[in-house]
Amino acid sequence: MEKVLALVLLTLAVAYAAPDPRGLIINLDNGELCLNSAQCKSQCCQHDSPLGLARCADKARENSGCSPQTIYGIYYLCPCERGLTCDGDKSIIGAITNTNYGICQDPQSKK
């Protein structure tokens, strides 16, 4: 038990001693491998194929392809930037398979 406690304390000491503000698990920059969008500074963890590695990426800009926010936290197309909405077809199957795609639009410019 004492060895386990010493190992945990040593691990914590090494983690806190690292001067780099970039995280190893959270606060990841674009291009770094991720498992969930919560790990990324941009809040988007994107992959190109079901078997591809996911990497942090920028959120979708106006008139770009997008995915609505999902509970999965990994996207084929990133959700829209703040203030934009992802307009597109939505279906139950698309929600399950994470393939509901749309275009980022500014809700203020719609009439």
From Swiss-Prot:
Compartment(s) where it occurs, according to its Swiss-Prot or TrEMBL record: Secreted
Any GO CC annotation of this UniProt entry: extracellular region
Function: Colipase is a cofactor of pancreatic lipase. It allows the lipase to anchor itself to the lipid-water interface. Without colipase the enzyme is washed off by bile salts, which have an inhibitory effect on the lipase. Enterostatin has a biological activity as a satiety signal.
Pfam families attached to this UniProt entry: Colipase, Colipase_C
Subunit details: Forms a 1:1 stoichiometric complex with pancreatic lipase.
One of the protein's GO biological processes: response to food
Tissue expression: Expressed by the pancreas.
GO molecular function list: enzyme activator activity; lipase binding
UniProt protein name: Colipase
Family: Belongs to the colipase family.
Designated gene of the protein: CLPS
Keyword match Transmembrane: no
Database matches in CDD domains: CLPS
Prodomain positions: 18-22
Classification via PANTHER family: COLIPASE (PTHR10041:SF8)
